[in-house]
């Protein structure tokens, strides 16, 4: 019996809202790769590196099918999916790669 691993189906956007749908086993690592241009091709060329949506699946076949389903949708349906959970289109990976030990804002006045 094989051990199941969680897979993530995710949607990235550029500042101009170009969309990319992908699948990964390690969302944090994949986002690092996208944000640092380490994956050549579409996402690097169009700066598609803001995580605007993701969901998890416990079976690889379910994740692959879901990715395929989303990729087959018209843009409007993808936008509705994103906005159903992230109306502000914030980058859900914001702050994941901040340097550790970075000083926060000063609490002193004056």
Regions found by a protein language model. Give the residues of each.
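GIY-YIG nuclease catalytic motif and its immediate N-terminal context
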Residues: 1-40, 44-57, 61-68, 85-109
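Short arginine-rich
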Residues: 68-81
């Amino acid at each position: 019996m094989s051990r199941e691993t969680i897979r993530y189906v995710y949607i990235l956007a550029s500042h101009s809202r170009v969309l990319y749908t992908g699948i990964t086993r390690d969302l944090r690592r994949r986002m690092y790769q996208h944000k640092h241009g380490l994956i050549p091709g579409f996402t690097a060329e169009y700066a598609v590196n803001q995580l605007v949506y993701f969901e998890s699946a416990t079976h690889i076949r379910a994740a692959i099918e879901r990715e395929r389903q989303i990729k087959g949708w018209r843009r409007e349906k993808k936008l509705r999916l994103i906005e159903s959970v992230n109306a502000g289109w914030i980058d859900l990976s914001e702050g994941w790669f901040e340097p550790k030990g970075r000083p926060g804002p000063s609490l002193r006045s004056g």
